[in-house]
């Protein structure tokens, strides 16, 4: 799943609460203030005090804020995140260990006799630890499974992954990497909540998922960046780019240990803030000429990729122009329209400079002005049709997943080295925000990818936070050689035979010049959760190359 938007009203968010995610519940009512003891000033207190005034008069006072913000931002020091407690398992506990140094030392001759390294990249600092998971221990699926850690020994980073073979034809079916967003949310929530082999029930039992995406593909679920889910590190992570080299190393070492998968088609898929991650990761892979990763396409669901083009569509989606009744009243909608020009000017400054100084203010102002009004209603930001349920992320099922994964026998079966699991790490979310990553223009990498592979952007049409209007708009605005033909292409029906044997229209699609956009009807932010059969239908069609042009 994954994305959150915690704490969009800046005053309280920066100082004490989770900042923005692309997935987040409405803020809890603030308790009555109590007398505070004299303590050392919080490093964010000055920033909080300045931005507190934005709550009701963001537009009127922003010029004053901008007069003061340079010194404030320059003095920001993100909070020190205490490292997770962990117990490193001995090497004897692992089925395989792949040493990056051994792979980096391998040289081969090409047809002309030129000697070069077998695979590109700096790999010596990495090891991949692999454990064969006994399917009968957990009952998640009866297919072959592996779990383990990618270790960056130089930087003390340890990324957890869990691999499931295809239920159909593991020797011939494609392989997929799945990433959730946040930033800071575990991909195991996507696995159990959306598209993995099983879900977790209210009584913390495993329930088989007949619509799992591993029905016709093998899948790696990866907890990244570090300190997300079962991953851990003593080092903080604060931007999208940092993880790309780690993921390249993980895939390279994994396919070295399991060469049978390396020749099969490989795809990267994810949702929400993975709209930032995936263009960077895919570009990193494709920049390595000698690689054992057969990357064929990328898939981004309800993603945040081009804020400048996507943010103008928050008001239409909240105000009844996205195919569902309005959530906000007309006065609030007009106030969002008035705030938009300033928001776009600030995002443009972020795009022009790509610095914390320009990108952080854009995140704060735009999220308060264009997302904050919706957040205050109590409506589910991931599904405009329903109210937010329970605490945290609006879906009680996520608590079931956390309870299941924190059971000692589960952690032991997987070789987990940390002492607990949490679905989303708000410290990471805050760090990404404070370093300006939220508003950066990662869509600029997509044309490079389109020249080499198909790209799918899909969106459940009931989502607010990364809505279909914005995702359709940015694909149509994207500057690449196929822009005109793609933008002019009509939307066509997506159909399937449903479980009752009836031919059903479940969405719309447009595709040209390697770029495809899908609108999935009756689905929210987590499309496979709301429409499991339809999601498996379009995923299988995509993986089979139905819209490929390269």
Swiss-Prot record:
Main location: other
Protein name per UniProt: Carboxypeptidase Y homolog A
Glycan-carrying positions: 216, 493, 514
Annotated compartments: Vacuole
Keywords associated with the record: Carboxypeptidase, Disulfide bond, Glycoprotein, Hydrolase, Protease, Signal, Vacuole, Zymogen
Annotated signal sequence range: 1-18
Gene3D superfamilies from the UniProt entry: 1.10.287.410, alpha/beta hydrolase
């Amino acid at each position: 799943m994954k994305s959150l938007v915690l704490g969009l009203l800046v005053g309280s968010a920066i100082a004490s609460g989770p900042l923005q995610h692309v997935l987040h519940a409405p803020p809890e009512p603030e308790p009555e203030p109590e007398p505070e003891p004299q303590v050392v000033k919080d490093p964010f207190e000055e920033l909080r005090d300045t931005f507190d005034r934005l709550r009701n008069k963001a537009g009127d006072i922003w010029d004053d804020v901008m007069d003061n913000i340079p010194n404030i931002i320059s003095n920001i020091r993100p909070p020190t995140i205490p490292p997770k407690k962990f117990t490193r398992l001995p090497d004897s506990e692992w089925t395989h260990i792949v040493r990056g140094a051994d792979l980096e030392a391998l040289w081969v001759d090409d047809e002309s006799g030129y000697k070069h390294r077998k695979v590109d990249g700096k790999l010596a600092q990495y090891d991949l630890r692999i454990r064969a998971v006994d399917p009968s221990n957990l009952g998640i699926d009866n297919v072959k499974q592996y779990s383990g850690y990618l270790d960056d020994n130089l930087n003390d980073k340890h990324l957890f992954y869990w691999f499931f073979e295809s239920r159909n034809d593991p020797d011939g079916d494609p392989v997929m990497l799945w990433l959730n967003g946040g930033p800071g949310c575990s991909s195991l929530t996507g696995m159990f909540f959306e598209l993995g082999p099983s879900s977790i029930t209210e009584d913390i039992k495993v329930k088989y998922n007949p619509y799992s995406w591993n029905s016709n593909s093998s899948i790696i679920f990866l907890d990244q960046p570090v300190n997300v889910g079962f991953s851990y590190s003593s080092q903080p992570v604060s931007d999208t780019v940092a993880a790309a080299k780690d993921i390249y190393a993980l895939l390279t070492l994994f396919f070295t240990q399991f060469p049978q998968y390396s020749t099969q088609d490989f795809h990267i898929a994810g949702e929400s803030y993975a709209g930032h991650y995936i263009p960077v990761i895919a570009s990193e892979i494709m920049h390595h000429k000698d690689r054992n990763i057969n990357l064929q396409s990328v898939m981004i669901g309800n993603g945040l990729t081009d804020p400048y083009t996507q943010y103008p569509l928050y008001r239409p989606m909240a105000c009844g122009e996205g195919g569902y009744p309005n959530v906000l009243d007309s006065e609030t909608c007009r106030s969002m329209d008035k705030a938009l020009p300033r928001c776009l000017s600030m995002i443009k400054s972020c795009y022009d400079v790509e610095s914390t100084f320009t990108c952080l203010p854009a995140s704060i102002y735009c999220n308060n002005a264009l997302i904050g009004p919706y957040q205050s209603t109590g409506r589910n930001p991931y599904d405009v049709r329903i109210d937010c349920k329970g605490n945290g992320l609006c879906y009680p099922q996520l608590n079931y997943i956390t309870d299941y994964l924190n059971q000692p026998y589960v952690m032991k079966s997987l070789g987990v080295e940390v002492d607990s699991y949490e679905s989303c790490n708000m410290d990471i979310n805050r760090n990404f925000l404070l370093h300006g990553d939220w508003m950066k223009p990662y869509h600029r990498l997509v044309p490079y990818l389109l020249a080499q592979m198909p790209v799918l952007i899909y969106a459940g049409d009931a989502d607010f936070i990364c809505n279909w209007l914005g995702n359709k708009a940015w694909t149509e605005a994207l500057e690449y050689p196929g822009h005109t033909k793609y933008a002019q292409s009509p939307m066509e029906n997506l159909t399937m035979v449903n479980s009752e044997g009836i031919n059903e229209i479940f969405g719309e699609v447009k595709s040209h010049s390697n770029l495809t956009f899908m609108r999935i009807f009756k689905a929210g932010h987590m499309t496979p959760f709301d429409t499991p059969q339809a999601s498996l239908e379009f995923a299988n069609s995509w993986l089979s190359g139905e819209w490929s042009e390269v």
